[in-house]
């Protein structure tokens, strides 16, 4: 009887130890899971902040085009897409233009760094920038799947240089002198006179007689040569 009680007591102690071990493990796992859940949003926020800093630092810059225009560019966000403004100086002239597009869909896939690098490279390759109304800034990373990411010029070149009063007066004088230019009389031009004379000579009786005589005596191959000599000898008006 005593042995039976000892066995039962030892069994109860073992069961209590197993239960306490399970409770301790459960208590350890709960704080770990909450810590991971708390850390994941903070890591996501940190990554988003870093990405936004990278994007902002790459959405403006300076460049020199192939035709030696010194320019700077900057991006502003709009309700639908973005505007990329370009301001340039070349040969003491200042001009600017704006390119517009919507690369939002492409930039969602962590392609912002590559996209802006390719935009900057495309700007440097431009020639006569802001002068062509069909200019488009394309990137390899986005242009196929996201054609709306191509930036198209929305307002062609805007000049800032103003015309001086002296140059303005010269232009006005040139315009006022235009009506006083000598007009050429087309009806009395040499070409018109020759054309009229040729048509009259074709119907002249003397010329017809000369051509007929030359054809009879000289043959078809020499008729023009003979007609020339007959014309010299007879001294017709034609």
Curated annotation (Swiss-Prot):
Q: List the taxonomic lineage.
A: Eukaryota, Metazoa, Chordata, Craniata, Vertebrata
Key words of the record: Cell membrane, Disulfide bond, Glycoprotein, Growth factor binding, Membrane, Secreted, Signal
Q: How does it assemble?
A: Found in a complex with FGFBP1, FGF1 and FGF2. Interacts with FGF1, FGF2, FGF7, FGF10, FGF22 and HSPG2.
| Record's keyword annotation contains Nucleotide-binding | no
InterPro entries registered for this protein in UniProt: FGF1-bd (IPR010510)
* Glycosylated residues (UniProt): 164
Membrane topology value: Peripheral membrane protein
Q: List GO BP terms, alphabetically.
A: cell-cell signaling; fibroblast growth factor receptor signaling pathway; myoblast proliferation; positive regulation of blood vessel endothelial cell proliferation involved in sprouting angiogenesis; positive regulation of cell migration involved in sprouting angiogenesis; positive regulation of fibroblast growth factor receptor signaling pathway; positive regulation of myoblast proliferation
Q: Which PANTHER family match?
A: FGF BINDING PROTEIN-RELATED, FIBROBLAST GROWTH FACTOR-BINDING PROTEIN 1
Q: Would you tell me the protein name for this molecule?
A: Fibroblast growth factor-binding protein 1
Q: Where is this region: Disordered?
A: 25-61
User: Where in the cell?
Assistant: Secreted, Extracellular space; Cell membrane
The record's GO molecular-function terms, alphabetically, read: fibroblast growth factor binding; growth factor binding
Assigned protein family: Belongs to the fibroblast growth factor-binding protein family.
Disulfide bond sites: 71-88, 97-130, 106-142, 201-238, 218-226
Leader sequence residues:
1-20
One cellular component GO annotation, for this chain's record? Answer: extracellular region
Could you tell me in which tissues this protein is expressed? Expressed in gut, eye, thymus, skin, lung, tongue, Purkinje cells and cerebral chorioid plexus (at protein level).
């Amino acid at each position: 009887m005593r042995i039976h009680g000892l066995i039962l007591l030892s069994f109860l102690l073992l069961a209590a130890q197993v239960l306490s071990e399970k409770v301790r493990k459960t208590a350890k796992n709960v704080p770990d899971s909450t810590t991971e859940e708390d850390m994941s949003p903070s890591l996501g926020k940190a990554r988003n902040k870093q990405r936004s800093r990278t994007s902002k630092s790459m959405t403006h810059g300076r460049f020199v085009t192939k035709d030696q225009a010194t320019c700077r560019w900057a991006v502003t966000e709009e309700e639908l897409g973005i505007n990329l403004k370009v301001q340039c100086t070349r040969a003491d002239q200042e001009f600017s233009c704006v390119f517009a597009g919507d690369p939002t869909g492409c930039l969602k896939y962590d392609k912002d760094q590559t996209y802006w690098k390719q935009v900057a490279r495309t700007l440097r390759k431009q020639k006569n920038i802001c002068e062509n109304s069909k200019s488009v800034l394309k990137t390899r990373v986005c242009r196929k799947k996201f054609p709306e990411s191509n930036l198209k010029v929305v307002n062609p070149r805007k000049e800032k240089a103003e015309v001086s009063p002296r140059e303005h007066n010269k232009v006005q004088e040139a315009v006022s002198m235009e009506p006083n230019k000598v007009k050429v009389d087309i009806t009395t031009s040499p070409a018109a006179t020759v054309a009229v004379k040729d048509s009259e000579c074709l119907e002249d009786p003397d010329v017809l007689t000369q051509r007929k005589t030359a054809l009879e005596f000289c043959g078809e191959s020499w008729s023009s040569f003979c007609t020339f000599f007959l014309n010299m000898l007879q001294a017709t008006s034609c």
